[in-house]
Amino acid sequence: MAKEIVKELLPLIRVYKDGSVERLLSSENVAASPEDPQTGVSSKDIVIADNPYVSARIFLPKSHHTNNKLPIFLYFHGGAFCVESAFSFFVHRYLNILASEANIIAISVDFRLLPHHPIPAAYEDGWTTLKWIASHANNTNTTNPEPWLLNHADFTKVYVGGETSGANIAHNLLLRAGNESLPGDLKILGGLLCCPFFWGSKPIGSEAVEGHEQSLAMKVWNFACPDAPGGIDNPWINPCVPGAPSLATLACSKLLVTITGKDEFRDRDILYHHTVEQSGWQGELQLFDAGDEEHAFQLFKPETHLAKAMIKRLASFLV
C-alpha cells in the first residue's frame, strides 16, 4: 500500500503521513577527505553544538603548511531550506574548489531543514555557529575547540555567505550581528550573497504579474515559515519592504551580491543592492553579474568558463 502524502512542494520535497520525508532534488552525501585529489584541500566533519544538534564540514587548503593565517568563510548551502546538506556532493566539490582558489578555511553548516524545522531554525543554527567561531578568537571554547581554527585562522577576516536560501540565512545573520554582539566582540569583515533568495507580494521588474502568488518562491516561503508575520512580506524574506529593519546595520565592512541572467531572484537582488546603497550603510558594496546562467550554476558546472570566472571573482573578494 502506498504511503499517504500529506504535503509536497514539487519538485523539491514530499512529506508523508508517517512523518517520513522524501527530498527529491538532493544530491548524495559524500565523505570528507584528508586530501582532495583534485585540489589538495583537507576536510573533516565537526560538531558545533549538541542541543540543538548542529554539525558542519570544515575545509583547510593545502597552503596551511605556511605560517600565514587564513580567512574564515562561514558558508550556507542553497536548497530552499529543505534539500541538500553540508555534506552533499555538489557542496563538497564546490567548497574544495573555492577553498583552494581563495586560500580560505571554509565551514559549511549542516543547519536544520524543513519540514520538521521551520524558519527561524536555520537562522539560529547559523548564529550558534558564528558564536562557536567567535569562541575560538578569544580562546573561550573549552568544550569543542577546533585545532584548524586555533592554528590557522585569521579572526580579523571572517566572511559569511551562501547560495540562494543559504544567502538569505547569511543576510539575516549579518543583520542580527549588527544589533547583537558576538562573543569577544568578533567582527565580520565581509558578506558574500550569491543570488540571495528574496521575494515579496508585489511583482517587480521582469517578474510575472500573472501567477505571482503561485510562484515556487512564494510556495517555498509559505512552507518554510507559515506563521511569519506579514507572510511573504516578512523582512526575513523581503528586506526591502517598507518598515523593514534598516540595512544600514548590516554587520560587515564589505558586501558582494552576485546575480545571474537566468535567475528568478535577479530583480530582487538588484533591488536589495540598491536598498543597501541608499540605506546609509558605510561599507564597500559590490555587485557582480556572472552572466547568462541559472543561480548556483558554479556548483553544478564548475568546469565551465563562466563558473571559473565567477569562482575567481569570489576568491578575489575573500581576502
UniProtKB/Swiss-Prot annotation:
| Protein name stated in the entry | 2-hydroxyisoflavanone dehydratase
Give the top-rank taxon of the lineage listed in the UniProt record for this protein. Answer: Eukaryota
Record-stated family? Belongs to the 'GDXG' lipolytic enzyme family.
The job of this chain, per UniProt, is described as: Dehydratase that mediates the biosynthesis of isoflavonoids. Can use both 4'-hydroxylated and 4'-methoxylated 2-hydroxyisoflavanones as substrates. Also has a slight carboxylesterase activity toward p-nitrophenyl butyrate.
What outcome is documented for mutating residue 164 to A/S in this protein? Reduction of both dehydratase and carboxylesterase activities
| Alphabetical list of InterPro entries matching this protein | AB_hydrolase_3, AB_hydrolase_fold, Carboxylest/Gibb_receptor, Lipase_GDXG_HIS_AS
| Pathway where this protein functions | Secondary metabolite biosynthesis; flavonoid biosynthesis
Catalytic reactions of this protein: (2R,3S)-2,4',7-trihydroxyisoflavanone = daidzein + H2O + H(+); 2-hydroxy-2,3-dihydrogenistein = genistein + H2O + H(+); a carboxylic ester + H2O = an alcohol + a carboxylate + H(+)
Q: Which UniProt keywords apply?
A: Flavonoid biosynthesis, Hydrolase, Lyase
GO MF term list: 2-hydroxyisoflavanone dehydratase activity; carboxylesterase activity; carboxylic ester hydrolase activity
Query: Would the keyword Cell inner membrane turn up in this protein's UniProt record?
Result: no
Q: What is its EC number?
A: 3.1.1.1, 4.2.1.105
Look up what happens after changing residue 295 to A.
Answer: Complete loss of both dehydratase and carboxylesterase activities
The Gene Ontology biological process annotation of the record reads:
flavonoid biosynthetic process; isoflavonoid biosynthetic process; isoflavonoid metabolic process
A Pfam family the protein falls into: Abhydrolase_3
- Sequence motif: Involved in the stabilization of the negatively charged intermediate by the formation of the oxyanion hole, positions: 77-79
Catalytic site positions: 164, 263, 295
For this protein, the record's Gene3D superfamilies field holds: alpha/beta hydrolase
